[in-house]
């Protein structure tokens, strides 16, 4: 495994650890998810470029589209929760309520 791939996988693992450890605020969870999507995008792009597999060249673009949709939904949820409850603490949310 090359050093570049190790760095990208380390970035993914650090983002995953941040997502698992810092779950108190919704904004920090969204930032960790974006870090994971960015490292997956770079990993997919480098893998496709190094393997010369041109049929899968649309995969990183599709991953970026899903990442943009995830960011838009996450930010709209953050705005809605902040306006409703006045804070972005995840512990204050009860998902079983209607």
Curated annotation (Swiss-Prot):
Superkingdom as given in the UniProt entry: Eukaryota
Pfam families: Oxidored_q2
Enzyme Commission number: 7.1.1.2
GO molecular function per UniProt: NADH dehydrogenase (ubiquinone) activity
Keywords carried by this UniProt record: Electron transport, Membrane, Mitochondrion, Mitochondrion inner membrane, NAD, Respiratory chain, Translocase, Transmembrane, Transmembrane helix, Transport, Ubiquinone
Similarity comment: Belongs to the complex I subunit 4L family.
Function recorded in the entry: Core subunit of the mitochondrial membrane respiratory chain NADH dehydrogenase (Complex I) which catalyzes electron transfer from NADH through the respiratory chain, using ubiquinone as an electron acceptor. Part of the enzyme membrane arm which is embedded in the lipid bilayer and involved in proton translocation.
Oligomer status and interactors: Core subunit of respiratory chain NADH dehydrogenase (Complex I) which is composed of 45 different subunits.
Protein name as annotated: NADH-ubiquinone oxidoreductase chain 4L
Gene name for this UniProt entry: MT-ND4L
């Amino acid at each position: 495994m090359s050093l570049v791939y190790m760095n990208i996988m380390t970035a993914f693992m650090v983002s995953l650890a941040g997502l698992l450890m810092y779950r108190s605020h919704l904004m920090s969870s969204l930032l960790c998810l974006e870090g994971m999507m960015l490292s997956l995008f770079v990993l997919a792009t480098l893998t496709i470029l190094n393997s010369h597999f041109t049929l899968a060249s649309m995969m990183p673009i599709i991953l970026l589209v899903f990442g943009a949709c995830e960011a838009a939904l996450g930010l709209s949820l953050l705005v809605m929760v902040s306006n409703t409850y006045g804070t972005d603490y995840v512990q204050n949310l009860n998902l079983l309520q209607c």
